Structure formats: structure tokens, C-alpha cells
Regions:
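A short beta-strand structural signal in non-transmembrane regions
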Residues: 34-39, 89-126, 135-136, 384-394, ...
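Acidic-histidine catalytic/liganding microenvironments
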Residues: 55-61, 272, 329, 378, ...
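Short amphipathic alpha-helices in soluble, non-transmembrane regions
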Residues: 48-56, 115-124, 400-411, 477-486
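Short flexible coil/turn linkers enriched for glycine and charged/polar residues
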Residues: 30, 96-98, 259, 380-381, ...
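Juxtamembrane extramembrane loops of integral membrane proteins
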Residues: 3-59, 65
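Membrane-embedded transmembrane helical bundles of large multi-pass transporters/channels
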Residues: 1-9, 23, 108-356, 471, ...
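Juxtamembrane segments of multi-pass membrane proteins
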Residues: 16, 33, 330-448
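Extracytoplasmic
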Residues: 19, 46-109, 116, 146-149, ...
């Protein structure tokens, strides 16, 4: 699949802010520049102009500004040397005069392939012997190129292989037989490749989130295989264990896969493109995993019927002791878990959101280091763009110029605006005598390739670019709001740019977090009611599904960790995966109740039958997610960390909270219709429990 980590793809697709930005791009071109920092060089050094000229000749660069090129354009319009130096300081020349910058504007072909353009720029710098500490390189295209490099298949392959090794070892520990383990892992690899093929056919693109798709598909497939094998082990005493196991397994497995599908599909409510695609791709992975694992794992058991062995009696007795302790003290267990979840849940009110393109990169990245150094010593790459629309006004050029200058002064008054740039920046503050009416002279002085940067549609649209500080990403939103306030009485002014889009993305992410979680919760609850045909049991069973999410997100709220793209997706996905174990236990509980057992005995039997595979499946899934911590992308790391934490918490909720809640369900004792097919040792422990209840 082709890689696409363009920053704009992470911004809301449909919004008023996005529409305004698209209009800005149509009139002035994309707001994308590559900033080259040259330490310890003076503007008059021949090397500076040589580099600028070579960069201008690249097909991906439409023009490269150097300090001398900025200055010469101003000199042509009679700007004084003192004023030129003042205007270039903080834009192309550092305040301490120990660094200067080249501003390379991307051409349409450069926008098509940013990575190739950045490589061409690096070749020019290398040819000019500007390497290491002798040059700094940053800008949106540089960040995108680095994201594409890190998102390459070769980088994802590392933690995928690591995950494959870990999960293979864990599967062998659970199964205890190499042939069956190898067969399951081959099915898993097939499911991953089939998922990638379907996503590719659907037109999907690779980005750093999609790097987690292979691990997600692996986890789905292995979880289903673990449950199929467990059902088979529990049916070994029956005449046809495979047929019996499939008869009992298909419903909870299919419903679990459906819940996972719902959790992932709920992400498709997002207006952020990569999140939408990840939701679709993950949902495809859930379906493919169901077909492969439920369809092919029985074939392995048919091929090697003796590969799956029953649990040892010592291990079974340990499980029964634990189950007995849980269901015999349901009130204490429920109260303890409830208090812990409630205390952590208070942290939900402290959740906040944040999106910063630099957070996508490793903290030690040279791209991040260069950006921070350039912003500290030279200028920021973040900007808010003001579009001034004179509509059909026939006012003279100079009248418009003075009006733009007044607006620019207002915008520059904000404390977080570090520098402004417009057509007026190339003209003197006071026009020399004889120039006032010479519009033809101004048009000639500002060549079309320069005019297009700040003028459009003749002289209708004028642009003022405001560079803003980025020390605190939260300041972007406040700065945008303040600039809107400063220009509120000027209807001709419209504000746009990447910075306000990022602010809009933060709100979209936070809103999408709650929307995807609530929609998946409601749909899964409805699915519970329809499949179990019991509203009370369904609502009771949803409590342990939401508890791990409340627990983990409450903790990050207490810790003050902001919700980013990676964390935002975990809630609905984890909910769909946590339901996996819940379905198996609820169906086992319901079958036992229908057989005439009490709530406490049914909870005990359900925990004995499903507790071990629930724990194994969650452990395998957690280990798979932990491998994502090896990713170079911070959001992917946070996604893996959050998913692992929630899945591990689901073991605690599934093996303690759920059986305790089930044991508390009221209901009249029914006549025992039949005895469940359970190991004799289980009955030996169950009978005293039933007798104790009767007493």
C-alpha cells in the first residue's frame, strides 16, 4: 500500500474551517515551505546564493527566498537598508546574526511527492557540503517525509516479527503442542495478508496508525483460535468432540467478532481520514479473522485430534478454588471492584485532548531537533493566514496597500505573533515622492511568481501571513481566537491556516472519542439483548465491559495525560474486544441457568469453563499490543500501551467482577433438568457448594 502521512489528512475533512482553508489553497497555493537553517554564515556569503539558486531549480520548488533576495526586492521599491534589516530579523536572519534561513516554497509537483522533494533538497545540501551541524532542515514537507520513512513496511516489519515470536511462545504455553501452535500461527499470517489485500483493493493508504493493523488482525485471529481449542478440550469426553465444540463455540465467537466489528466500525463516524480508514480496515480484519480462525482451526483439530489435551487435574483444581472464592463472596468482590473503578472514574472529568504533528515523531528525531532549534533561533513554521477580500472594489493599489498594512499591524499586536509578512512588507513605510501613482511600477517590481504568494485574483485577495510561537500547542487556539477578536469589526478579513485546523482537529478528536465510545456501547448493548434475550442479564453483563475503560481512562485523566489520535481510538476498539470474554461467560452462565442451576452455581460453572481461555486470549492480545511500543510513532505507542492496559484490566473485570455480579442475579431455583458435561473433579467441588447454598 502507498504511504500517506500528509499532515492535512489528519485534519477534519468536512468543516467550515477546512472549507476556508481549501479556498485559501486555491487562491494562494498550499501553505508548505521547507526552511533551511545555515548557522555561522553571512547573507553575503556566495555559498548562500549558490544553495538558493540550486534549490530554485529543483522541480519540486517553485521559488527559494534568501535574505539577499528578500532584501533586493525591497531595495527595488526604495526600502531603506535599516528597514530591510529590521524586517528580515526573525524571518530570514537570526537576532544574534549567527544563523540565516532559506525559505523554499513547494511547487505543485513538489506537493504531489513531498518525500522526493525533500530528498532532492538534501542532495543539494550534501553537494554543497552542508551536513550535520552545518545545516538545519525543517518544515511541513520534511515532517511528512520523515513520517513516510518511519511508516515504511521495513520499519513495521520489526515489531511485527517481534510480536509474532512473542505470541507464538505464548500460544505454545497455552496449547502445549508445537504442531497445533504452528498451524494456528500460519492461519494468523494468512488472515493478516488477506486483510491487507482487501484494504489495498479498497484503496487504503499506509500511515503510522495502519502499521498497527497487522497486530490487530493477529490478536483477533489468535483469540478466536484459543476459544475454539478450549471448547474442543472441554468436549473430549463426548463421542464427537469437534462437532460438539463447534456447536457450542460458534455463537459466542461470532457475537464476539461482531462486537469487535462494531467497536472498530464506530471509528468511521470520525471526520479525520486516517481514523476513518483505520476503523474500516480493522473492521475488515475482524471479519477476515472470524472466517479464517473459525473456519480453519477446526481443520487443524481434525488433522491432529490428539494435539489438544485436557487440562491437568491440579490446574483444574486451582481454577475451581479461585472460582469458589469469587462466587461465594459476591458482595465483597463487587464492592471492592466497584470502589476501585469509581475512584479512578473521577479522573474522566479531567480528560483533555491534544494533537501536534511533532508528537507523531520520536522525541530524539533529528527532524524534531532541527525544528526546535530553528524556532528558537530563527522563526516558527506555524502560521495563521489572514485573507483580505476587497471584492470588486476599484480602489487604487496604494489605498489597498495602506489598508492591508493597518490590518497587519493589528494582527502583529498579539503577543504570540512573532512575525508577519504580506505584500506591504516589500514596500517602504512612506512612499517616496513620484511613486504614489505608479501602479505599473509596483506590478513590474513584484514579479508574478512573487505576487502569487501574497496576491490573488488580480488585486482582490491579499494575504497576511502571521508566524506564531509553538512553545505551548494550546496557545494556537487562543491566538486564533484573539486574532478573530482583533479583526471582528473588519468583515473583509477571514482567518485560516494549518494552526486553526489543528485546533479544530483537537475538538473533533475529543468529540469523536465520546461519540465512538457511546455508539459502540449502545450497539453492543442492543446486540447483547437480542442474542441473550434478557435485558437484565445484558445490562448486568455490560458493567464489566465498561469497567476496564473507565479504570484506565480515569487513571490517565488523574495523571493529566492528554487524549491524542492514538488514545482516542482505544476506547471503542477495546470495548469491542473486551466483550469477547464476556460473551463466552454469559452464554455458559445462561446455559447452566436453563439447565436448572442457581445463579451462584451457574456463575461458578461458567467461570470454570471459560475463565482460562478468557485469561489466555486477553494475555495474548495484551502481549501483541505491547509489541506496538517498539513503534517509532508516539500515537501508535500510546495506542498499544492503552490497549494492553485495558485488555489486562479486562482479565480482572472478567474473572472477578462478572462472575460476582452473575452470582448476585436473583431468580427462583429451578428444577435441575440435566447435568452439564463437566469433569468429575468439577462436580466434586460443585456439590458441596450447592449443598452449602441449600443450607
Amino acid at each position: 500500500m502507498p504511504s500517506n502521512n500528509d499532515i492535512e489528512t489528519w485534519l477534519p475533512i468536512e468543516s467550515e474551517v477546512r472549507s476556508t482553508y481549501e479556498m485559501f489553497k486555491q487562491e494562494f497555493g498550499a501553505e508548505e515551505v521547507i526552511l533551511v537553517g545555515l548557522p555561522n554564515l553571512s547573507p553575503d556569503d556566495p555559498l548562500v546564493e549558490s544553495v538558493a539558486e540550486r534549490l530554485s531549480q529543483l522541480p519540486g520548488i517553485r521559488h527559494c527566498w534568501s535574505p539577499n533576495r528578500f532584501g533586493q526586492t525591497m531595495r527595488d521599491l526604495s526600502v531603506s537598508e535599516e528597514k530591510i534589516a529590521e524586517r528580515l530579523t526573525g524571518l530570514a536572519i537570526a537576532k544574534d546574526k549567527r544563523m540565516l534561513g532559506l525559505v523554499a516554497l513547494l511547487s505543485p509537483s513538489g506537493l504531489v511527492d513531498r518525500s522526493a522533494t525533500v530528498r532532492d533538497v538534501e542532495k543539494v545540501l550534501d553537494y554543497c557540503q552542508l551536513r550535520g551541524e552545518n545545516v538545519l532542515l525543517t518544515g511541513g514537507p520534511v515532517i511528512v517525509a520523515e513520517l513516510n520513512r518511519l511508516g515504511d513496511v521495513s520499519h513495521n516489519r520489526i515489531f511485527f516479527i517481534f510480536t509474532l515470536i512473542l505470541t507464538t511462545a505464548l500460544m505454545y504455553h497455552c496449547i502445549g503442542e508445537w504442531k497445533l501452535t504452528a498451524g494456528v500461527m500460519l492461519i494468523t499470517v494468512f488472515a493478516i495478508e488477506a486483510t491487507n489485500a482487501v484494504v489495498y483493493w479498497c484503496g487504503g493508504e499506509m500511515n503510522f496508525l495502519m502499521g498497527a493493523l497487522a497486530v490487530m488482525t493477529m490478536v483477533f485471529t489468535l483469540s478466536i483460535a484459543v476459544h475454539v481449542i478450549n471448547y474442543y478440550k472441554n468436549s473430549l469426553d463426548l463421542p464427537d468432540p469437534l462437532a460438539n465444540s463447534l456447536r457450542n463455540a460458534w455463537k459466542p465467537i461470532a457475537l464476539s467478532a461482531l462486537s469487535t466489528f462494531i467497536g472498530l466500525a464506530s471509528l468511521m463516524t470520525s471526520t479525520i481520514g486516517p481514523v476513518w480508514w483505520f476503523g474500516l480496515s480493522g473492521a475488515v480484519g475482524a471479519v477476515v479473522s472470524l472466517v479464517c480462525a473459525l473456519g480453519l482451526t477446526p481443520a487443524l483439530l481434525l488433522l491432529w485430534p490428539d494435539a489438544a489435551q485436557k487440562a491437568e487435574s491440579r490446574s483444574l483444581m486451582s481454577q475451581m478454588r479461585m472460582a469458589h472464592a469469587v462466587v461465594s463472596n459476591p458482595w465483597k468482590t463487587t464492592a471492592f471492584v466497584g470502589v476501585v473503578v469509581a475512584v479512578c472514574g473521577v479522573g474522566l472529568w479531567s480528560l483533555s485532548c491534544r494533537i501536534d504533528p511533532l508528537d507523531f515523531l520520536p522525541k530524539g528525531s533529528s527532524v524534531v531537533r532541527d525544528l526546535n532549534e530553528l524556532e528558537k533561533r530563527l522563526t516558527s513554521i506555524d502560521s495563521i493566514e489572514a485573507i483580505i477580500d476587497f471584492e470588486t472594489s476599484d480602489a487604487p493599489f496604494m489605498e489597498k496597500l495602506y489598508r492591508v498594512r493597518e490590518i497587519e499591524a493589528r494582527l502583529a499586536s498579539d503577543s504570540n505573533v512573532t512575525h508577519t509578512m504580506s505584500v506591504a512588507s516589500f514596500f517602504p513605510d512612506e512612499m517616496p515622492e513620484g511613486l504614489m501613482g505608479s501602479t505599473q511600477f509596483f506590478t513590474k517590481a513584484l514579479e508574478s511568481k512573487h505576487r502569487s504568494d501574497f496576491l490573488s485574483a488580480g488585486e482582490r485577495y491579499w494575504r497576511v501571513s502571521c508566524r506564531i510561537g509553538r512553545e505551548d500547542p494550546a496557545m494556537k487556539g487562543r491566538t486564533f481566537a484573539n486574532l478573530k477578536r482583533l479583526t471582528a469589526d473588519i468583515p473583509q478579513v477571514t482567518l485560516t491556516g494549518i494552526a486553526p485546523l489543528i485546533e479544530q482537529a483537537q475538538l473533533t478528536i475529543f468529540q469523536g472519542f465520546w461519540e465512538s465510545l457511546s455508539s459502540s456501547f449502545l450497539l453492543i448493548t442492543v446486540m447483547f439483548v437480542v442474542s441473550l434475550r434478557s435485558l437484565k442479564l445484558s445490562l448486568w453483563g455490560m458493567i464489566p465491559n465498561i469497567s476496564p475503560i473507565v479504570l484506565v481512562f480515569g487513571i490517565i485523566g488523574w495523571a493529566g495525560v492528554a487524549v491524542d489520535v492514538g488514545i482516542m481510538m482505544t476506547a471503542s476498539i477495546a470495548l469491542g474486544m473486551v466483550v469477547d470474554g464476556t460473551f463466552h461467560m454469559l452464554i455458559a452462565y445462561q446455559r447452566s441457568r436453563n439447565a436448572g442451576h442457581s445463579s451462584q452455581t451457574s456463575a461458578f460453572q461458567a467461570l470454570i469453563r471459560t475463565g482460562k481461555p478468557i485469561c489466555e486470549a486477553a494475555m495474548i492480545a495484551s502481549v501483541g499490543m505491547v509489541a506496538l511500543l517498539m513503534s517509532s510513532f508516539s500515537p501508535t505507542v500510546r495506542f498499544g500501551m492503552m490497549m494492553a492496559a485495558i485488555l489486562l484490566s479486562s482479565i480482572w473485570a472478567g474473572l472477578l467482577q462478572l462472575p460476582a455480579l452473575l452470582a448476585l442475579l436473583p431468580g427462583k431455583r429451578q428444577r435441575k433438568a440435566r447435568t452439564l458435561a463437566m469433569p468429575e473433579t468439577t462436580l466434586e467441588v460443585e456439590q458441596p457448594l450447592v449443598q452449602r447454598q441449600a443450607a
